[in-house]
């Protein structure tokens, strides 16, 4: 545990909330910090344990006593805090390959499981191994041991693309054993070592190059993991906006003159309106194209025939839009299909703001107080006008009368004596008993229980 001392200069609010206490059998700790508050600027963190308040041991204080102690500090608050050290994981030992890795050498013409073996066939009396270019014969004393070696062949570690013995037997039975075995190719490549003796003459077999392992593209993370303000933005009492962009015009593809196409068109034999897949035919006039042409929406056009269906402008350059089978230039498409701004009633041709089930220009949807564009941030509605979070909290935010903290969305609160209170802050000013749902008295805007109704405050 790391203990330290923090001194905050007054006046209140101090910018933090407490949780726990002797009455809860939980040590006092910091449960919440006000962003940019005095406690946050002094380095206090959520979860820090409170050891003492102005020199008094906090372990013997109840929750209410700790709050009263903090309120009584006036212009200077001294806190003794303790912070748990993060647990560091033990360093892992690096895995090092063995000094002398095993080497394998196979005969060039040997193939794995050339002929299928029935499961009940007796094993051979001895086995043949090849090591460093020499043949070694090892007798097998017992047939059951050989059978055990065959059965445990599938248990050996193999590359991810390797096939088991049972799978190769099945490939032989189904007639697919001619297919190349990736396991055999992998073992051949990994076991190539220089030989001192002259190799036996064998036919050269070209080896295919296997592509290296590809790094999988990272999957898109969910928004609540990427955006740290996701939860705050979509709180129940907030409204969010969505930014989109108006459709961008497509561009036709120009193709240069091709001699083979011109010759095929001039050679005759096909009708003027037919298209055999080699000769381009204009989709507008249905005539063979003998020169430059454009390709758009899967059809070929004479450059002068590809025009806007509304104004007749040639669309060879500048892009176009397609809507319900008709082609439009960008200006005609904006006039006819672009959405209108809910404020200025003009067409929106750039970024579109979606808010309150309407569309807006980005510069038209602004905070009613600071006139700053809200863009893709959360906002509050008050009397039919949008406000950014900062101005809304400044103008309409509700604070607790007891602890002077803001009452956030989801907090339980009550209204009494003309003020708002957290449910845990509405207590008797003398004995600190909770007065929620109970009869109480007031003196100098402070709640009192029945027992202290006539006490001096």
Swiss-Prot record:
Pfam families linked: LIM, PDZ
Residues covered by the LIM zinc-binding domain: 280-338, 339-398, 399-457
GO BP of this protein: actin cytoskeleton organization; cell differentiation; ossification
Feature: compositional bias, Polar residues: 126-135
Modified residues (Phosphothreonine): 96
Keyword entries, A-Z: Cytoplasm, Cytoskeleton, Developmental protein, Differentiation, LIM domain, Metal-binding, Methylation, Osteogenesis, Phosphoprotein, Repeat, Zinc
GO molecular function: metal ion binding
Compositional bias (Basic and acidic residues): 144-157
Modified residues (Asymmetric dimethylarginine): 103
InterPro entries: PDZ (IPR001478), PDZ-LIM_domain (IPR050604), PDZ_sf (IPR036034), Znf_LIM (IPR001781)
Places the protein is found: Cytoplasm; Cytoplasm, Cytoskeleton
Residue ranges constituting the PDZ domain according to the UniProt record: 1-85
SMART domains reported in the protein's UniProt record: LIM, PDZ
Residue(s) carrying Phosphoserine: 78, 111, 247
GO cellular component, one term: nucleoplasm
Region of interest called Disordered, as start-end residue ranges on this chain: 82-166, 186-226
Biological function: May function as a scaffold on which the coordinated assembly of proteins can occur. May play a role as an adapter that, via its PDZ domain, localizes LIM-binding proteins to actin filaments of both skeletal muscle and nonmuscle tissues. Involved in both of the two fundamental mechanisms of bone formation, direct bone formation (e.g. embryonic flat bones mandible and cranium), and endochondral bone formation (e.g. embryonic long bone development). Plays a role during fracture repair. Involved in BMP6 signaling pathway.
Domain notes: The LIM zinc-binding 2 domain (LIM 2) interacts with TBX4. The LIM zinc-binding 3 domain (LIM 3) provides the structural basis for recognition of tyrosine-containing tight turn structures. This domain is necessary and sufficient for interaction with TBX5.
Name of the protein described by the UniProt record: PDZ and LIM domain protein 7
Organism: Mus musculus
């Amino acid at each position: 545990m790391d203990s330290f001392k923090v001194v905050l200069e007054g006046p209140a609010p101090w910018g933090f909330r407490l949780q726990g206490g002797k009455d809860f059998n939980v040590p006092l700790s910091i449960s919440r910090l006000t962003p940019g508050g005095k406690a946050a600027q002094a380095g206090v963190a959520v979860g820090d344990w409170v050891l003492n308040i102005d020199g008094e041991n906090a372990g013997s204080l109840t929750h209410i006593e700790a709050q009263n102690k903090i309120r009584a500090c006036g212009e200077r608050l001294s806190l003794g805090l303790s912070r748990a050290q993060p647990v560091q994981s033990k360093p892992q030992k690096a895995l090092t390959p063995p000094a002398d890795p095993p080497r394998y050498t196979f005969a060039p013409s040997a193939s794995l499981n050339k002929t299928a073996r029935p499961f009940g066939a007796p094993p051979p009396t001895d086995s043949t191994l090849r090591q460093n270019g020499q043949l070694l014969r090892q007798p097998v004393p017992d047939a059951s041991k050989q059978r055990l070696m065959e059965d445990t062949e599938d248990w050996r570690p193999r590359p991810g693309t390797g096939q088991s013995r049972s799978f190769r037997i099945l490939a032989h039975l189904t007639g697919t054993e001619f297919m190349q075995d990736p396991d055999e190719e992998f073992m051949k490549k990994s076991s190539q070592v220089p030989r001192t003796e002259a190799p036996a003459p064998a036919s050269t077999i070209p080896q295919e190059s296997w592509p290296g392992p590809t790094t999988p593209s990272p999957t898109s993370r969910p928004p609540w993991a990427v955006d740290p303000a996701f939860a705050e933005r979509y709180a129940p009492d907030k409204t969010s906006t969505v930014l989109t962009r108006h459709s961008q015009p497509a561009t036709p593809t120009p193709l240069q003159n091709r001699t083979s196409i011109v010759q095929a068109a001039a050679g005759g034999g096909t009708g003027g309106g037919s298209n055999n897949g080699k000769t381009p035919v204009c989709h507008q006039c249905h005539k063979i194209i003998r020169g430059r042409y454009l390709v758009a929406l899967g059809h070929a056009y004479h450059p002068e025939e590809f025009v806007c269906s509304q104004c007749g402008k040639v669309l060879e350059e500048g892009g176009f839009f397609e809507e319900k089978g008709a082609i439009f230039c960008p200006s005609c498409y904006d006039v006819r299909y672009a959405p209108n701004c809910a404020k200025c009633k003009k067409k929106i041709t750039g970024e579109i703001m979606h808010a309150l089930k309407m569309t807006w220009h980005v510069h038209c949807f602004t905070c009613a107080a600071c006139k700053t564009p809200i863009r893709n941030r959360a906002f509050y509605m008050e009397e039919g006008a949008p406000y950014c979070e900062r101005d809304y909290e400044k103008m309409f935010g509700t604070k607790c009368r007891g602890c002077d903290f803001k009452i956030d969305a989801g907090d339980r609160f009550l209204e009494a004596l003309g003020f708002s209170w957290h449910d845990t802050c509405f207590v008797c000013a003398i004995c600190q008993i909770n007065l929620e749902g109970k009869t109480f008295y007031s003196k100098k805007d402070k709640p009192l229980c029945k027992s202290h109704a006539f006490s001096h405050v």
